[in-house]
Structures are given as C-alpha cells and as structure tokens.
Amino acid sequence: MRHTLPIAPQFYVTAPQPCPYLDGRMERKLFTALQGESADKLNDSLSQQGFRRSQNVLYRPSCAECSACLSARIDVSEFAPSRSQKRTIKRNHDLARRATSPWASEEQYELFRSYLDSRHADGGMADMDVFEFAAMIEETPIRSRVVEYKNQDSGALIGVSLTDVLSDGLSMVYSFYAPDMTKRSMGTYMILDHIEIAREAGLPYVYLGYWVPGSQKMGYKSKFSGLEVYIGGNWQKVRNPSEFTAETHPLSTDPIAEQVANIQLPDTRPTR
C-alpha cells in the first residue's frame, strides 16, 4: 500500500514591532500554520513547547534581544487557592458557566468591544470588527470551546473564554469580561474555574499564555500556586516569582535557526 508522508510544518518570523508589554522593546514572533488532519497533534506538541494558537496559526515569542515573555501553565495537582482566590470564588457564586461550540454571538462581541475599549484601547486588537471577532472565535482547526459566564438572575453575560482542549490540559486562548465589575476579578475567576474544569476532566494542566515579569498587565498570573514556565526547552516550577526579571542579556536568546532546529514535531506518519 502506498503512503504519502505529510509535509513538515514551515516556520516563519514576523517583522519586529513595538512590544505591547514592556516599553522601549521590540517583539518578534516565530510562527507556523495549523492545518490538515494532524492539526490536533501539532497543536498539542507545540503547546507543550511554549507555542500559542491564534485562529489557524501557532506562534511563540522569538525576540532578538529579549526573552522576558515566558509561556505559563498551572499544574492542577499542585494548585491550592489562596485566601484572596477563595474570596474571588465566593464573590462569583451567582454566575452560571456554559460551554458551547466555538460560535460567535452579537452579545459576545458587545462584551468584547466594551472590554477592549476599557482595557486595551491602544492594543493590536482595538480595531477588530464583528467579522474579525467571529473569525477569532470560529476559525479553529482543533477542538475548542467557548466558555460563557452569565449572571444566574439577570442572564447578563459577564465573561467569556475561548478555550482549546489539549491532550494534557486546557489552553485559555483569549478571555474577556465586563470591565466595570472590578470587584469580581473576572480574569482571576475564569482561571480558577478552568482549573476546576481541568480537575474534573482529569487533565493535568491549564495553559495561561504568557507571563511577563515586570509587566503589570501580566502580574496576576504569578499569583497562582502550581505555576510553571517554559525556559530553555523545559517546564520549570515557579517557587518565587520575584526571582524572574525582564532584564535582557546578549546571550538570553538563541538564533532563529537553532530555535527551529530544537522544535520537536509530532510523529504524524500514517499508521495504516
């Protein structure tokens, strides 16, 4: 029987642009397309190596002179809520969670716009229209869910997370919430709830995206016990977040060719 081996993913690098997290720095990303029958395997493999998904693209920071962005995940078995996090859970007891297929709605887009206008008005997604929003939610070649959080009494949509289901955990691709309900700490609450979802499903990790030491926008991620970051090809436990800094070093980043050569691709050869 004749078999055709799949084409190996091709990796590319974006042009440098201003970093959205650290002033005065430039960011650059290494990326590849996510498509075909082996998309799930590729997404699983590269997610475990610090990559993130955006629609049908997988990317990882590959800045020329900076390695401050650290891919972060929570080891569910090592997590225990702090007193503050327990209070956050209690404050949101009136919310109902609903996980659905990745379909966008006008209600979601209205919440998304409110969130962006309040929190990220100068960000790269600030001009996203309803069609681009729908593409962000719906264009997924892998198993994804939209997790909605609504007030049980009023039915108002309070928070949304676009979540990928990996072989070893949940990946919170993008989350947004009502910006005027600061006392709810919805960003933290949705992570706490995803930890519980993963625990119930027997999945060991919750992938959070990137933690950037020195960035106030990302500081909340370091407050979760069981946190791990991807450094030098390995996941390392974060015992003391203050030990991690955003300082640059001339030897802190490997050349692009070396980074690509060290990426472990899944075995996608046909088994039949």
From Swiss-Prot:
GO terms for molecular function: arginyl-tRNA--protein transferase activity; leucyl-tRNA--protein transferase activity. InterPro entries: Acyl_CoA_acyltransferase (IPR016181), Asp_Glu_LeuTrfase (IPR017138), N-end_Aminoacyl_Trfase (IPR030700), N-end_Aminoacyl_Trfase_C (IPR007472), N-end_Aminoacyl_Trfase_N (IPR007471). GO terms for biological process: ubiquitin-dependent protein catabolic process via the N-end rule pathway. Keywords: Acyltransferase, Cytoplasm, Transferase. It is an enzyme of class 2 (transferase). It is found in: Cytoplasm. It catalyses: N-terminal L-glutamyl-[protein] + L-leucyl-tRNA(Leu) = N-terminal L-leucyl-L-glutamyl-[protein] + tRNA(Leu) + H(+); N-terminal L-aspartyl-[protein] + L-leucyl-tRNA(Leu) = N-terminal L-leucyl-L-aspartyl-[protein] + tRNA(Leu) + H(+). GO terms for cellular component: cytoplasm. Its EC number is 2.3.2.29. Transmembrane segments: none annotated. It comes from the Bacteria. It holds the Pfam family ATE_C. NCBIfam families: PRK01305.1-1, PRK01305.1-3, PRK01305.1-4, PRK01305.2-3. Belongs to the R-transferase family. Bpt subfamily. Functions in the N-end rule pathway of protein degradation where it conjugates Leu from its aminoacyl-tRNA to the N-termini of proteins containing an N-terminal aspartate or glutamate. This is Aspartate/glutamate leucyltransferase. It comes from Roseobacter denitrificans (strain ATCC 33942 / OCh 114) (Erythrobacter sp. (strain OCh 114)).
